[in-house]
Amino acid sequence: MELPAVNLKAIVFTHWLLTVFACMIDWLPKAYGLANITILAMGVWAIAQRDSIDAIFMFLIGLLLTILTDILLFALYFTEAEKASESGPLRDLFRFSSGMGIFSLLLKPLSCFFMYHMYRERGGEYFVNLGFITLSRDRSSYQSIEHMDPPADQDNKLPSRTY
């Protein structure tokens, strides 16, 4: 099944609009707006440099990090802001603003999926090397099943133990 072609500009514009709507009322700390606008600036960088693997990778990692920060900030500030605006004139605006922030948070994993697909299309390969664990797509050390080479060190092989 082929993935639908999603425009990077549409993703950046959607998250920008939802971030602006989420910041309409002052219920979230400035860290929310700064983090999301910074990541959207990386998205603009990825739009400007179409062949850059680094730009799309930084945007992808930034989106993943803002998922975590958004969850943390919503968990810390939502209930207090909801109580403060419950009986005030800004109740509906708070509901709209918080709804747009939550909708942005729900769209971010889907955006990350499309960003990863674009990253792979641009030629990016993700390598993880933790010393003892290596996750990569480098298959140069694999042997073909049809042409198996004999093991090199048959003489240095330890004898089997008898128990």
From Swiss-Prot:
Record topology, Extracellular segments: 1-28, 77-95
InterPro entries: AGTRAP
Annotated GO biological process: angiotensin-activated signaling pathway
Keyword Magnesium: no
Main localization (coarse): membrane
Subcellular location: Membrane
Membrane topology annotation: Multi-pass membrane protein
Cytoplasmic side: 50-55, 117-163
Function noted in UniProt: Appears to be a negative regulator of angiotensin II type I receptor-mediated signaling.
UniProt-recorded name of the protein: Type-1 angiotensin II receptor-associated protein-like
Native source species: Xenopus tropicalis
Gene: agtrap
